[in-house]
Amino acid sequence: MTTPGYSGRPQAAKLGLKPGHRVHLQNRPDGWALADPPAGLAGPGPDGTADVILAFFSRAEEIGGQIGELARRIYPAGALWVAWPRRAAGHRSDITDTVIREYALPIGLVDVKVAAIDHDWSGLRLVWRTEHR
């Protein structure tokens, strides 16, 4: 049986995680972990760069203070997932996908996917615009 609001795809597939990817979890909530991550995931490189960053935020103002540095760490071809509390799960937050775009678009990022990361978190996948790579 599948959970309402979910595609049935494994979390790692939704997030685009592959063996060998360098992954960083920013502002990870206590007790939160990737569900069934692929073998061979690694932490960020010595300079903090990563193929995929999953950053959790509860308030919009937190995004503005961190998105520039997070974007630098995925340059040129990585992905930044900005996660916020899912309203469909009864959580409250001032973050929406529109709010995230207001921070992301002016610095050269573009959104390419939205997904339910899990029961409690929604996510918007951001990448560098092709002309900025």
What are these regions (language model features)?
Residues 108-133:
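Class I S-adenosyl-L-methionine
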Residues 94-113:
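Conserved Class I S-adenosyl-L-methionine
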Residues 54-63:
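Short, glycine-rich nucleotide/cofactor-binding loops
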Residues 16, 38-40, 68-70, 95-98:
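Short, glycine/charged-enriched secondary-structure capping and boundary segments
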Residues 1-38:
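N-terminal, charge-rich interaction modules
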